[in-house]
């Protein structure tokens, strides 16, 4: 399955705390924060200044809110702000939606990157103050737009990483083939590389539907 990390990684026997210019940074990897009583519980005993978690968390509809709620719980558990970093892009049948963010100890959302695109953000976190300044918070897409953009990104990266030069579509005139054509166009295929073939059987819609 997607989360069968034992195929690639050997588990460590203790949690990691890094010292960066005097700041104690606890490090967690993806599934670590989803397990109650796991590595985060150990980090809660380490008096850390920041919890950093690196994720390859694939897109699911509604998962953005689930991640945020989980991060708020973990930040409160370790009594420190939390930075949630997430991969972005398509990998075979998976789409990673990005949307990295920062939450404060009290659950305030301090920074959020856009979804479905690479982004380089800088955020100043002062662990010596009680209330942090809020940075740039990217708006969440409309639910329908979110699903559509995930499909387009998955198609775009799959085609690019397999070195496909174009697409050939069977266009019946129905909504489904029209939507696929729109996705191909939004994925960046120029008109000369996107060929549409109108089906000549008895099922296609009349030409005046176009």
Give the positions of each predicted feature.
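Enzyme catalytic cores with a strong preference for nitrogen-chemistry domains
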Residues: 1-170, 176-195, 200, 205
């Amino acid at each position: 399955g997607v989360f069968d990390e034992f195929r690639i990684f050997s588990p460590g026997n203790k949690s990691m705390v890094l010292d960066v210019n005097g700041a104690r940074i606890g490090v967690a990897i993806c599934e670590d924060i989803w397990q109650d009583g796991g590595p985060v519980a150990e980090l809660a005993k380490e008096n850390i200044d920041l919890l950093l978690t690196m994720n390859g968390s694939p897109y699911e509809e509604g998962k953005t809110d689930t991640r945020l709620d989980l991060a708020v719980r973990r930040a409160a558990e370790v009594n420190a702000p939390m930075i949630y970093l997430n991969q972005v892009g398509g990998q075979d049948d998976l789409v990673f939606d990005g949307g990295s963010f920062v939450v404060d100890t009290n659950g305030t959302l301090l920074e959020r990157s856009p979804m479905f695109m690479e982004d380089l953000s800088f955020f100043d976190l002062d662990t010596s103050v009680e209330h942090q300044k809020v940075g740039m918070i990217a708006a969440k897409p409309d639910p329908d737009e979110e699903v559509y953009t995930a499909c387009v990104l998955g198609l775009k990266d799959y085609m690019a990483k397999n070195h496909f030069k174009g697409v050939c579509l069977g266009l019946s005139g129905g909504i489904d083939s029209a939507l696929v054509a729109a996705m191909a166009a939004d994925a960046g295929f120029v008109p000369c590389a996107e060929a549409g073939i109108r089906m000549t059987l008895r099922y296609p819609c009349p030409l005046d539907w176009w």
